[in-house]
Amino acid sequence: MAYDLDRFTSRRSAVHATGGMVATSQPLAAQAGLSILRDGGNAFDAAVATAAALNVVEPTSTGLGGDVFALYRTADGEVGSMRACGGAPAEATIENVSQSVREHDDAESWYPEARGYAVDGGDENEDLEMPFLGPHAVTVPGTARGWETTVEELGTLSLADVLEPAIRYAIDGYPVSEVISYYWQGAPRLFTDDHAREAYLFEEEPPDPGQVVTLERLGESMQKIADEGADIVYEGEIGEAIAAEIQDQGGFMTLEDLAAFEPEFLEPVSTTYNGTEVFELPPNNQGLIALEALNIAEEIGAGDHPYDSPERVHAFAEAMKLAFVDGHHYITDPEYETVPPLASKAFARERAAAIGDTPIQDPEVGVPTNAAEDADTVLLTVGDSEGNLVSYINSRFAGFGSGIVAGDTGIALQNRGASFSLTPDHPNSLEPGKRPFHTLVPAIAKFDEDDWAAFGVMGGYMQPQGHLQVISNLVDYGMGEQEALDAPRWRYREDGTLGVEERLPAQTGLVRKGHDVRILQPSLFGGAQLVRRTDDVLTGATEPRKDGQAVGF
């Protein structure tokens, strides 16, 4: 079916309620989370219920084969975070993966769009890129254990209770939404994997909008997790299927790799931006990039420019450019290498000096004082009547991930390992047990003691750029919550160009400043969700570029 998702723009209003609020990219998933709140669960229970439902109704973006991160503010005012992100298998060394790439008959299929690499001969690992698809791109999935840990440590209901709506959608069926049908149509790697074809195609075709589908295999796996707990994924039947599938396709993951995984609770990192405190997760993800960009933008007064001016976009984009260069150079798994304090105000002052009236060409990495353009991810935000707020993000990285579905489980496995490098001295060089650089970044903002928001912007390297723009829209320009998400966006791109939405008013002025401006489709500018609690009132806003919905009671 041919249709244009972006032909017309629909108007949305922010949603207000006091009993509870859920905002996410799929209405059916939002309703699943809301049902848990109505049944007495708290925001954390509802977050897992919503995430599980998204696994079913938005399977192009998320699932049990991926990872999950959470950033939250509890009813008593504590700000915390959880990382459920696994690492590389114990046998996944640079040498082993490089040899496998050179010798495997199907290695070319692991590199979409002829990425260019050496397959035959040569001893230099620099000739090789880390595979983007296939068994070596799969790291230990953290989602199942992350869901279980969230409910056990922060929730009030059982895992079986919160998984029930998702299981019902998977077994009984649901109508596919417009945006998800669009992405489902564009998943060509499914056609090369028998288990994926059986689990996610219907009479050999992706579903059309409104078509009712069932995902029985996935639903059966979820029911097993509900009955037996996450151990079945890491030590039992489902884990055995994951390890066997990866090994059958030439990878190294074992049941022992899966069994060794545990989620972690971490101290968030934060900075202030024009009086608002913004909290992010610490490395191994992009949180520090967002904070560094906010600090640089504050230092140069980026938010002082008129909203419609090219000077505003130029200033913020240059701050983002420098933060990306630094983040991609320094951020790695902190258990393997120390990550410097990129979020310090002093470092931002040094970096701000490089920004002028024209774009920086070939920016150099800063030295802190210290001792996929597109990606498929889901984000949800939840608030409850007790005062809990949570930003919860779940992803397999690129679409259906590695292109591998684990046997008859219906679980599509992520390709986060594609972020590793096969160059030994690279900050994100592949090492056994090491966690890859992660794009997932949920966020919390504190405007004052009685005014907090859980928010985020899904979408690969758009995520920290989206955080910067949403916070500035709220803080610098006084926008309402839905307005801040509706506003036209820009994004700095890896090739040095500046992508903008067609409705961004500053395009011509940016070209005059020397920017190489490209008009991009709205789907490349991320998907934001936000729930704000001001005094005792919850306000929800959702991404107009997605199918999403904010619902409250």
Region annotations inferred by a language model:
Residues 1-31, 35, 43-229, 233-235, ...:
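Noncatalytic scaffold domains of N-terminal-nucleophile
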Residues 44-51, 160-171, 241-244, 307-324, ...:
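Short, well-structured alpha-helical segments that form the helix of a local strand-helix-strand
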Residues 56-60, 67-83, 88, 97-98, ...:
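Active-site rim segments in enzyme catalytic domains, especially the processed small/beta chain
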Residues 62, 66-74, 378-382, 442-444, ...:
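Short beta-strand scaffold segments in enzyme catalytic cores
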Residues 265, 374-377, 438-440:
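Short, small/polar residue-rich loop motifs at catalytic or cofactor-binding pockets
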Residues 299-396, 408-409, 416, 521:
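Internal maturation/activation junctions in enzymes
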Residues 337, 434, 467, 476-522:
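Extended C-terminal subregions enriched in glycine
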